[in-house]
Amino acid sequence: MSTEGGFGGTSSSDAQQSLQSFWPRVMEEIRNLTVKDFRVQELPLARIKKIMKLDEDVKMISAEAPVLFAKAAQIFITELTLRAWIHTEDNKRRTLQRNDIAMAITKFDQFDFLIDIVPRDELKPPKRQEDVRQSVTPAEPVQYYFTLAQQPAAVQVQGQQQGQQTTSSTTTIQPGQIIIAQPQQGQTTPVTMQVGEGQQVQIVQAQPQGQAQQAQSGTGQTMQVMQQIITNTGEIQQIPVQLNAGQLQYIRLAQPVSGTQVVQGQIQTLATNAQQITQTEVQQGQQQFSQFTDGQQLYQIQQVTMPAGQDLAQPMFIQSANQPSDGQAPQVTGD
């Protein structure tokens, strides 16, 4: 082992002074050893013997061998600790760490065999922050679902009712045209209408099932507005839309009376001066009517568009009225 401290500088620390006088002091202790000193060792001899027995070629161990190994291990540990403590003082610390021992092994060639046993704790590089990529979804047509149900839990959009698979009919219309659609009795049929700039309005009307539901249809009617959103993964989510008191005044429901039920969509456009509103009347050849049993209603849907084709930011106007006895649908003008 090395007998030189190898430290420069005018002022030396306590660890450096102890290391400089370490080997002269150790050699003096070895010369002064007696037989009594071999009986008591600072390191337990049982561990030394156990380590020596790990070698399969070792058959017998003499009494002096464990004593010599214990003394050599004591000297080795003391010198390595002094060199590691020097690194601790250089870093203005008072606690010996594992990294100090690793630095002492790295600086001195006599400890090279311990490099793989006591690896140096390298500072881990900071993780790179992953760039957050925001994907812009393409402009998709916004769909609105107006659900008119006899009971709150009686109608489900795109579901099943009374063991029957619901069917949907989709009709594309242009501004100025009128579509009249009516589902069959006993089924829930959503009707989707695309108006102008890619906006779609879907109406789901639940027909009464039997006399028991017809009796409760007068007080159990509810309306639910849902917005359909297409996510980045392609999934379709339906989010309920809450209506305030100002928007609820556009939605009026009447008690079911005897007669027929007609769903009539009418589109109006505003004039250039934004004062005169023209109404597209329902043509006789474009109207479709279906006759049903008693206890049904008349609904009319209106949507106002600007001359440039932009829709106004107002909810749909749905009005329920009784149909005259002559079987003709009344005309409702825009406000």
From Swiss-Prot:
Cysteine pairs bridged by disulfides in the record: none
Gene Ontology MF annotations: DNA-binding transcription activator activity, RNA polymerase II-specific; protein heterodimerization activity; RNA polymerase II cis-regulatory region sequence-specific DNA binding
InterPro entries listed in its UniProt record: Histone-fold, Histone_H2A/H2B/H3, Transcr_DNA_Rep_Reg
Localization: Nucleus
Protein origin, superkingdom: Eukaryota
Keywords, sorted A to Z: Activator, DNA-binding, Nucleus, Transcription, Transcription regulation
GO cellular component: CCAAT-binding factor complex
Gene3D superfamilies noted in UniProt: Histone, subunit A (1.10.20.10)
Assembly description: Heterotrimeric transcription factor composed of three components, NF-YA, NF-YB and NF-YC. NF-YB and NF-YC must interact and dimerize for NF-YA association and DNA binding.
Function, in words: Component of the sequence-specific heterotrimeric transcription factor (NF-Y) which specifically recognizes a 5'-CCAAT-3' box motif found in the promoters of its target genes. NF-Y can function as both an activator and a repressor, depending on its interacting cofactors.
Family the entry assigns: Belongs to the NFYC/HAP5 subunit family.
Protein name: Nuclear transcription factor Y subunit gamma
Record organism: Pongo abelii
Lineage of source species: Eukaryota, Metazoa, Chordata, Craniata, Vertebrata
Gene: NFYC
